[in-house]
Curated annotation (Swiss-Prot):
Key words of the record: Ribonucleoprotein, Ribosomal protein, RNA-binding, rRNA-binding
GO CC annotation terms, alphabetical: large ribosomal subunit
KW RNA-binding (keyword) present: yes
UniProt protein name: Large ribosomal subunit protein uL11
UniProt xrefs under SUPFAM superfamilies: Ribosomal L11/L12e N-terminal domain, Ribosomal protein L11, C-terminal domain
Biological role: Forms part of the ribosomal stalk which helps the ribosome interact with GTP-bound translation factors.
Name of the encoding gene: rpl11
GO biological process, alphabetically ordered: translation
Length: 164
């Protein structure tokens, strides 16, 4: 028998045995508490955000695995800055400022879904999203910070982050 996949959207770190999870996995004969605990462990870093989760179940052995999707980069930036939404006019209206540490943190979360081969490249993708949202980085225009990354200005931060 082939594996069954259940896809749900849960709040990071706060999944409960109630809907939508319980009714979706209960009929498969799984220990719902075990599944909920595993999902909460896997999604705790996305607290306060809706996170897509796939539960892959082998109906014969009752074994399951959890695949956690990552919220969009813009959601992660908004969470990091405590924003409701990005700027409607990013060229004229700046709504927040990210530190390089925050950029690296978001890049590490999103890296598995990005095409970027290095953490630096992933950080530059995050900075590109910040630009379109009206968010500065280190108090500067995001395009300037991208050039500084290429010039090696933040190399120490990246080396430290790669080791963590």
């Amino acid at each position: 028998m082939k594996k069954q996949v259940v896809e749900v959207l849960v709040e990071g770190g706060k999944a409960t045995p109630g809907p939508p999870l319980g009714p979706a996995i209960g009929p498969l004969g799984l220990n719902v508490k075990q599944v909920v605990d595993k999902i909460n462990e896997a999604t705790k870093e996305f607290a306060g955000m809706q996170v897509p989760v796939k539960i892959i179940v082998d109906p014969v052995t009752k074994q399951f695995e959890i695949e956690v999707g990552v919220p969009p980069t813009s959601q992660l930036i908004k969470k990091e800055l405590g924003l409701e939404k990005g700027s409607g006019e990013p060229k004229h209206n700046i709504v927040g400022n990210l530190t390089m540490e925050q950029v690296i943190k978001i890049a590490k979360m999103k890296r598995s879904q990005m095409l970027a081969l290095t953490l630096k490249a992933a950080a530059k993708e995050v900075i590109g999203t910040a630009l379109s949202m009206g968010v500065t980085v280190e108090g500067k225009d995001p395009r300037i910070v991208q050039r500084e990354i290429d010039e090696g200005v933040y190399d120490e931060l990246f080396e430290k982050a790669e080791k963590e």
